[in-house]
Structure formats: structure tokens, C-alpha cells
Amino acid sequence: MRPTQFVLNAAKKKSGFSVPVELTPLFLAMGVALASGTWFSYKKFFHDDSLRVSRKNPEQSALDKVLNQKAE
């Protein structure tokens, strides 16, 4: 009995990009790490009142106090 074309095509390896099964946990762990890093950074930058990213509120700066203490 000769194999048909359908059976021969099923036995061929699929071409294209395939990810090994062993890398699935790595991709999952990296996705969780990236998502948690993004979430914690967002939380720190947008909800922390003591964090000073720019000079919009100079009253929160302690630089003048430190410079005045050094000058005295």
C-alpha cells in the first residue's frame, strides 16, 4: 500500500516560527516581571507626593536649607 499525498503532507514538518515548549515558562515569567515593573513604576510616579521629578514645586526642595547650613 502506497501512502497518499495527504499522509505525506501530514508527516512533513511545518515551516514557520515555532517556539519550543521549554521556553513557555520563561516567557510567562518575563511577562509577569514586565507587568509588575510597569505597575510599580506607575504607582510610584503618579501617587507618591514626596517624589519630585521636576521643579514645579520648589517648597519641597531641601536644597536651600542644606546650602544655608553649609554657608553658616
From Swiss-Prot:
Provide this UniProt record's keywords sorted from A to Z.
Membrane, Transmembrane, Transmembrane helix
Principal place of residence: membrane
Where is the protein found, in the record's own terms? Membrane
Query: Does the record's keyword annotation contain Mitochondrion?
Result: no
Q: Mind telling me which residue stretches traverse the membrane in this protein?
A: 20-42
Q: Tell me the protein family, please.
A: Belongs to the UPF0495 family.
This chain belongs to the protein called UPF0495 protein KLLA0D04334g
* Organism per entry: Kluyveromyces lactis (strain ATCC 8585 / CBS 2359 / DSM 70799 / NBRC 1267 / NRRL Y-1140 / WM37) (Yeast)
Q: What is the lineage of its organism?
A: Eukaryota, Fungi, Dikarya, Ascomycota, Saccharomycotina
